Curated annotation (Swiss-Prot):
This is Probable DNA-directed RNA polymerase subunit delta. Belongs to the RpoE family. Participates in both the initiation and recycling phases of transcription. In the presence of the delta subunit, RNAP displays an increased specificity of transcription, a decreased affinity for nucleic acids, and an increased efficiency of RNA synthesis because of enhanced recycling. GO terms for cellular component: DNA-directed RNA polymerase complex. The keyword Transmembrane does not apply. Keywords: DNA-directed RNA polymerase, Nucleotidyltransferase, Transcription, Transferase. Residues 14-81 form the HTH HARE-type domain. Residues 115-163 have a biased composition (Acidic residues). RNAP is composed of a core of 2 alpha, a beta and a beta' subunits. The core is associated with a delta subunit and one of several sigma factors. GO terms for biological process: DNA-templated transcription; regulation of DNA-templated transcription.
Length: 180
């Protein structure tokens, strides 16, 4: 099935994933995701805004559709082109490419940080100044702050007389009377 199969059909009724599948079948080779999107856009005659709105769903569909396979580096192919056993071998494994010279990475831009003042940037790796106050001095543990009544509470296992008088014990005879 290729793009020729869609001739005569209303292009508004076609899904981007159907068109992408046909484009890959017609080309017969791996394609970068951006090239697939451009080809889909040209075939469907959609505006940049329409494609931009549908792009996240299209990418998700390509990942979840069983007919597409990511070859790494945002390059896609049809799974039917590869025998089942060779799929893992065909995928690019960057950790295996030790001898390949690396491209220089450009400095990443953080949109949330202003470019003029670095004073407002929080350094989470530095020690917290409040942590320095955690040193315990002997004068901080003054035992006069605690009353003797607080120390006696730990040994108090008995209930107050007011509540003991209100409690009653249940006997087996009392439980049997309820069943009748």
């Amino acid at each position: 099935m290729g793009l020729d199969d869609f001739q005569g059909q209303n292009k508004d009724e076609l899904s981007m994933i159907e068109v992408a599948r046909a484009i890959l079948q017609d080309s017969g080779k791996r394609m970068a995701f951006a090239d697939i999107v451009n080809a889909v856009q040209n075939f469907l005659g959609k505006s940049d805004e329409e494609i931009r709105e549908r792009l996240p769903q299209f990418y998700t569909d390509m990942n979840t559709d069983g007919e597409f396979i990511s070859m790494g580096h945002n390059v896609w192919a049809l799974r039917s082109w590869f025998p089942y056993e060779s799929v893992d071998e065909e995928v690019n494994h960057p950790e295996d490419e030790e001898d390949v010279p690396r491209k220089k990475h450009h400095k990443k831009v953080n949109a949330f940080i202003g470019d003029s003042d670095d004073d407002d940037i929080i350094d989470y790796d530095s020690d917290d100044p409040e942590d320095e106050d955690l040193d315990v001095d002997e004068e901080d543990t003054n035992e006069d702050d605690y009353s003797d009544d607080d120390l006696d509470d730990a040994d108090d296992n008995e209930l107050d007389d007011g509540i003991e008088g209100q409690l009653s014990e249940l006997h087996q005879d009392d439980l049997d009377d309820d069943d009748e």
